[in-house]
């Protein structure tokens, strides 16, 4: 799953957060309200792949060891985004 277009959507909609969770569509938070990006229910594999796509090798090693990770990424022309990835009920969220 390519997450980067969702960062562009966040900037366009002035969203403060982007959420991925298994068995639910991706959601964004705008003015305190959480709303789905689309109707596609994400599988656990899709959520995990989306998270891994954003990590470098060292971050992936840390996440694999600690089962949680906080980091930031910069997208040219869009800005800097803070990322929190963790395990919840056996799945990546």
Regions found by a protein language model. Give the residues of each.
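N-terminal "pre-motor" subdomain/linker immediately upstream of P-loop NTPase catalytic cores
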Residues: 1-93
